[in-house]
Amino acid sequence: SIRNPQLYPLKPCKGTASMTLGCLVKDYFPNPVTVTWYSDSLNMSTVNFPALGSELKVTTSQVTSWGKSAKNFTCHVTHPPSFNESRTILVRPVNITEPTLELLHSSCDPNAFHSTIQLYCFIYGHILNDVSVSWLMDDREITDTLAQTVLIKEEGKLASTCSKLNITEQQWMSESTFTCKVTSQGVDYLAHTRRCPDHEPRGVITYLIPPSPLDLYQNGAPKLTCLVVDLESEKNVNVTWNQEKKTSVSASQWYTKHHNNATTSITSILPVVAKDWIEGYGYQCIVDHPDFPKPIVRSITKTPGQRSAPEVYVFPPPEEESEDKRTLTCLIQNFFPEDISVQWLGDGKLISNSQHSTTTPLKSNGSNQGFFIFSRLEVAKTLWTQRKQFTCQVIHEALQKPRKLEKTISTSLGNTSLRPS
């Protein structure tokens, strides 16, 4: 009967200028097996040995490599009728020069209007002209913000390099882990950092919320919201605002809310000029109290990075839905930044927010750095069967003016139609 092989990658314990690797293929029947080596190295030679054994077979394949950089070698084995597996071996030269990494960041308590944190990755003692740097956030490569990488020193055949990356305060305060990934001589080196321990009053949390695209581009009344939660009371709490163009600005609205868990929250709303926000001017919300060791400062500006317009898809109700309601779903994906507004219309008229709900933006998987959301609308079965038209309206800054995109669905249309508004 057919028996598939077992694979064992073989590697010497000690590195030399040239290195011989092996791939042991054993306990298979019948002959033959095919062994193929793959590598990014041009300096390699291979030898395949004949199979041994009267019943279960065993064979070996060898590859010899030489060079100054680390490389991956993959042994790929096939055995009829369907066996198809690989094993990969990393080869590091004996005389590899390992650089030293140092990852630094700017203040953990940034009070500047442009709420960015600077990450600096210093790479000391690498081979000249043999270094590449990439940045990761929670193990995912950052592609929407460009890093600045410069050579800072040459010492014979060695050099030192610095890479600088700007991230938003929101990214930093999310407690994500940021990684500087350096590749030199084919080997990866990593340095990690994350935000400093909390320096603010325990329990009191402050959020600074940007203008919604709906208010910014359609209603013409953009506003910033500063939300302070988990206060004992509003007594002696002082909330002030600063704007980059002015020393201070006055909020137009202030709300206090008492909660069942005996805490108090404060909401301060600041109207902003749309042109100032779009041009990137910064704002600060400062929360102070006599018992605080220091004021809580939150800064915000328009999110930096390459813009990406959303893709919009509307799905009809599922056929299995049997009650008097019908559920329409709108998928909005691959947009950046994450600020987005979604509304639903019925025959061109705005539908109440109580009839639909929208998820918070979620990060897309894979290499795409965009976001996606779902919006769900419930309508009466009679309205759907009467061939009413329902529209998912999306407002986002990366769309063409007037920054709106609509997708309409109806039983009378037969399918959906997409149009900019």
Swiss-Prot record:
Keyword Glycoprotein: yes
One Pfam family this sequence matches: C1-set
One GO term (biological process): B cell differentiation
Main location: secreted
UniProt-listed PANTHER family: TAPASIN
Task of the protein: Constant region of immunoglobulin heavy chains. Immunoglobulins, also known as antibodies, are membrane-bound or secreted glycoproteins produced by B lymphocytes. In the recognition phase of humoral immunity, the membrane-bound immunoglobulins serve as receptors which, upon binding of a specific antigen, trigger the clonal expansion and differentiation of B lymphocytes into immunoglobulins-secreting plasma cells. Secreted immunoglobulins mediate the effector phase of humoral immunity, which results in the elimination of bound antigens.
Description of how the protein assembles with itself and partners: The basic structural unit consists of two identical heavy chains and two identical light chains; disulfide-linked. N-terminal variable regions of the heavy and light chains form the antigen binding sites, whereas the C-terminal constant regions of the heavy chains interact with immune receptors to mediate effector functions.
Name listed for the protein in its UniProt record: Immunoglobulin heavy constant epsilon
Encoding gene per record: IGHE
